[in-house]
Amino acid sequence: GVHVEDRGYQFADAVYEVIAVVKGRMVDEELHLKRLDRSLREIRMEMPFTAGIFRLKVAELLRLNRVVNGSLYLQVSRGVSPRNHQIPSAISPSVVMTVRPMIPPSAEMFGRGVAVITVRDIRWRRPDIKSVSLLPNVLAKDDAVRNDVFEAWQVDDGVVTEGTSTNAWIVSNGTLITPPPADAILNGIT
């Protein structure tokens, strides 16, 4: 379980990645690890494992859970320490990984797309850091569900930044439209 004094639980002092797994292999693993490393550095942490150790642990997790096609959730928190806003000087990070089977999108979703609503982007000013602090996303996704649509796209000053749990993509007249890479958004990978 998660310790009650884990800083990820107490302060959302943690970052995460979600990696697709297809035929037992992680999709774009290196890009996800690079983004995780960047997020960690931005919150003044270091990567707690090597890529080799990570691959071994993921292989074991996939085998034990019998997942061939699914998603891997990886969270790294600063670790356990008495509750204090100051970052502790000597602390070991906590790493949590889970896997689950993936339900692929339907052919209709691919063919027709999905309905979305737009909501004001009320997240903090560093969405380029993949922080576990997702309360604005949770509330926006709830708005989408209550409006019987698939997703809520977050809008900041008239610009679509991203969905609550998706990248924002529009195909119009055969042209793919998506927000350009920037610090104001979390750049998508997979």
Predicted regions and their residues:
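Helix-start/capping segments and mature chain N-termini
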Residues: 1-60, 82-190
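Active-site microenvironments in enzyme catalytic cores
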Residues: 20, 64, 75
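Ordered, amphipathic secondary-structure segments that act as subunit-interaction surfaces
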Residues: 58, 67-76
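A structural signal for short coil/turn segments at secondary-structure junctions
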Residues: 65-69, 147-148
